[in-house]
Amino acid sequence: MPSIKVDGLDDVFARLKAIGGDIESVQKRAVYAGMGVIRDEVVKQIEQLPVQKGYLKSKDLPRDVITPREKEQLIMHICIASMDSKNGTVSTAISFDGYTDIKSKKYPNGLPAVLVARSINSGSSVRTKHPFMRQAQAAAKARAIEAAEKAAREALAEMMEG
């Protein structure tokens, strides 16, 4: 799973500690802002995946495309996972939540969205690899760090005012 580490906010956290502010809430706000930028880039990468309508027969394997329905379902189920805080570090991930409306023999209630995303991102025996998550992370890394730093500084300013 791609990860981004934001350094350079030591001054913000030192000032927060000095005024007795809640450092973890500021960290979570910053992480959420940065992950929002990455989530938007993941959606953009999914929208750029090659699409082919209709059922693909076994002679078309491995697939180098996704169906419009798979694309729609991925975009619908993308989310920012709940945050985890350990030893002063806050982390989260971009994930795909729930089940799609794409039914199969093994999944009569719908395929897990994360399974569809993983098969497209990593490839499989019947699908060519399209690493959209890694491409999104690489494309949005600088903007995500910028957004996280901005959110942390805004939170500090609000705490100092109030």
Give, region by region, the residue ranges found by the protein language model.
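Secondary-structure transition/turn motif
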Residues: A93-I102
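Short, Lys/Arg-rich flexible segments
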Residues: M1-T92, N109, A113-G162
